């Protein structure tokens, strides 16, 4: 992530996306901690605490930007999938263990109502206090406050659901262009250039081609490994659909669910979109790259490590080449020209 240009640009100029993306990383981290627990054997706090923090950070991400809701869908899929695995495992033992698994799962679901519904709603309502502080006289009771919050949600939803809005923007970029850096977004450039000044600057929002294109290959590898280790079978003597796996490695499904939860909702957004909307998907792309290089087979381990080192060096080289465009650094025209040839980014001559 440190070598990605979009990450540098978005965080350096402190766009709102920086905060929900950070919270999304934390909420998925704590959901991962929950998935790594066997709540039938371990103490209750081992499962409840990760869920509490995951829900807390989900509330913070939604309060920052609605992309946190997309993450919530991914968390729900991961949670119920893990619960299903536990129940399936218990069903192979005896009736008492199955009843215990169902009872504990139900208790966790009740806790999740607090962690993933009530707490996020409270955080979201409280986040409007600074905004409504300027509406003197319009809010005289908690009921008025809630009505104004609902009114704000309706206004935002109507804005985002207006077909074609913003599609005439010169840097409009549909969702399928983001992974291939189809149209970087222009942010700023130097307009007043003193006489004799030979350096230039410009700021664009775009990704490191090595990381973004490498991430697509890594996602394809994760999908292949996920499909390779799964087979679906209905056992006639059981009421459960058994999802069997030749491996207990759930990293691939975790990455794919997280990525698709952040990326696929943008397919349904009818208004104009831009490349920075891909920002929340980047942590899962980078995780996919790391997982793809993590090989346990000693026969291939050295080769993958060498390839990982070469990949990191290539990413660093491209980051240095494109660095001036990512942060607006004043540099010579020759340096900027390299970025201009690689991507559709430019500067005022």
Residue ranges and their predicted role:
Residues 46-65, 263:
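Membrane-interface alpha helices of multi-pass inner-membrane proteins
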Residues 46-50, 209-212, 234-258, 303-309:
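Membrane-interfacial loop-to-transmembrane alpha-helix junctions, especially the N-terminal start
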Residues 23-35, 57, 73-80, 122, ...:
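Transmembrane alpha-helical segments
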Residues 1-2, 9, 29, 58, ...:
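Short helix- or helix-capping micro-motifs
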Residues 191-194, 201-245:
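Hydrophobic, aromatic-rich transmembrane alpha-helices
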Residues 50, 77-87, 91-116, 120-125, ...:
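Transmembrane helical bundles and short interhelical boundary loops of multi-pass, membrane-embedded
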Residues 6-19, 64-67:
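Short acidic/glycine- and proline-prone juxtamembrane loop motifs at membrane-interface regions
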Residues 27-50, 79-90:
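Membrane-interface transmembrane helices that cradle and orient dolichyl/undecaprenyl
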